[in-house]
């Protein structure tokens, strides 16, 4: 880009637009309280803050809770769909996840906000997710924390968050680059964890003499 303009987010390319989340969404909601009564050993995924991570914008399921959700409005309202953007709204604020095609039936709990965009052909959910997880998005969450000593974000606050909007084509290109980098980082982190585990095991054996080394 060669031409720039001033905006609420600072200097941005002249061709980009600015919008708050509320203008881009079908709805913004959060899970209901009291769903512990629906906990089950089988059923649907129940997405909690622990299923979100600051490492990337994909969900993580090392620790899962299953539910058998109630029929009717509450179950329908909090059921996630592909492309939904999830935001933690208590405790560790502004942790982001974007629901992808591989996710089974799932619902959000009361500590997670669900943002559903009006048109995913005009606005890529992963563009919004990457932006919200970056510095400019996180700075807005920090400024809008409405809980004082007790961290918290309400739904009107989420709707007020401002995002930049390049063309859909540019959004998609940026998303591909960032997703690829996240994938490469994840692969390397997995390899690193394996090497660290191997080193720990070898240290135990080598430093106690359980495994002998040949000295030339």
At which residue positions do the language-model features occur?
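Sequence-specific dsDNA recognition surfaces
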Residues: 4-7, 22-37, 50-82, 102
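A short glycine-rich beta-alpha junction/loop motif
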Residues: 89, 105-113, 126, 146-169
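Amphipathic alpha-helical coiled-coil/heptad-repeat segments
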Residues: 9, 164-216
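Periplasmic-binding protein-like
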Residues: 137-141
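Non-catalytic DNA-recognition/assembly elements of restriction-modification systems
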Residues: 2-31, 160, 168-169
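A short beta-sheet element
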Residues: 48-50, 65-133
């Amino acid at each position: 880009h060669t031409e720039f303009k001033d905006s609420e987010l600072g200097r941005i390319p002249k061709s980009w637009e600015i919008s708050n989340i509320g203008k881009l969404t079908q709805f913004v909601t959060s899970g209901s309280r009291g769903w512990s009564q629906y906990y089950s050993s089988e059923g649907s995924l129940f997405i909690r803050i622990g299923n979100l991570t600051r490492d990337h914008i994909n969900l993580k399921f090392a620790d899962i809770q299953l539910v058998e959700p109630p029929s009717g409005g509450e179950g329908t309202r909090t059921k996630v769909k592909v492309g939904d953007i999830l935001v933690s709204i208590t405790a560790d604020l502004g942790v982001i996840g974007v629901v992808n095609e591989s996710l089974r039936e799932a619902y959000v709990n009361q500590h997670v906000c669900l943002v559903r965009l009006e048109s995913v052909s005009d606005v890529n959910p992963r563009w919004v997710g990457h932006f919200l997880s970056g510095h400019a998005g996180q700075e807005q969450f920090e400024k809008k924390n409405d809980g004082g000593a007790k961290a918290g974000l309400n739904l009107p606050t989420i709707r007020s968050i401002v995002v930049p909007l390049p063309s859909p084509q540019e959004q998609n290109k940026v998303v591909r680059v960032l997703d690829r980098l996240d994938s490469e980082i994840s692969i390397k982190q997995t390899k690193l964890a394996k090497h660290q585990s191997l080193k720990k095991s070898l240290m135990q054996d080598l430093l106690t003499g359980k495994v002998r080394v040949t000295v030339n």
